[in-house]
Structures are given as structure tokens and as C-alpha cells.
Amino acid sequence: MEPERAHLVIWQVGTNSAIRRIPTDQFAARLRAGIDIGKSLGANFVLMNLQYVPAVVALPDEEEYARVMAEVAEEKGAGLFRRFEIMRSWYNDGMPYAQFVTNDGLHLNDFGQKCIGKLLSMSILDAVNPRRLTGAPNTPH
């Protein structure tokens, strides 16, 4: 019996690379290679970009990693879930980090994970069923 292959890969990436100060050209090359391997096995990709958390925001070039991810996603035909921008909007709208980040300043707490999970699920459903966005009836042709 052959193992089932992944149809969709959601790759949470960028946070550790940014913190470890991986040069962005190397980061981009690793993204391309990973997507190429997965696509060669028949998987579709969604890149989930880095987290907007104190450990990342303190870096001098955190937005450069988000930019590189967007470029590679477009180049490789992968989806991009903009977690960085979503979390930044929470913070800019007055939500304190403590409400969605653990005490280590790096990882999402249960509330943050739940919110990101729901938004990601809705994004995937909207991508595979655009009629959800328009309210049009979902009738087969």
C-alpha cells in the first residue's frame, strides 16, 4: 500500500530564519527549493509568513523577510497567508502582545493560535470556493 501524498502543504516559515539572521538570499533559495520539492510530489503550497511578535519586531529588517516570502510565493505560484500583517494589525489596533503571544515574546498563545487557525481555514475555503465570497449559490455545472 502506497502512502498518501500531501495535497496541501501549509509552511509556517520565516520567524526562525529572521531571528537567526539567515541572509535573505539564502532564505529565498531555501523557500524555492522546498516549494520545488513539494510541487514535484504533487502538493500545493501556502506559505504562512513570519509572526509579528516582540522577538521579531526588534530586528532591524523583519519586513524584508515578509517581502522575500511574497516574492517567492508569487514566483512559484504558491499561496501566501499574511500572518505578519494580520498580527501587526491586531497590535496596531490596540491589542497587547500578552493577549496573543506567550511570555517568551516569540510563540503564539492558545488564543493567538485559534485566531490564526480560523483565519487560515476561512482563507483556504475562500480560495477553493470563491462563491463563498459572493454569496452565489454553489451549484455544479
Regions found by a protein language model. Give the residues of each.
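Alpha-helical cap/lid subdomain in secreted, periplasmic
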Residues: 1-141
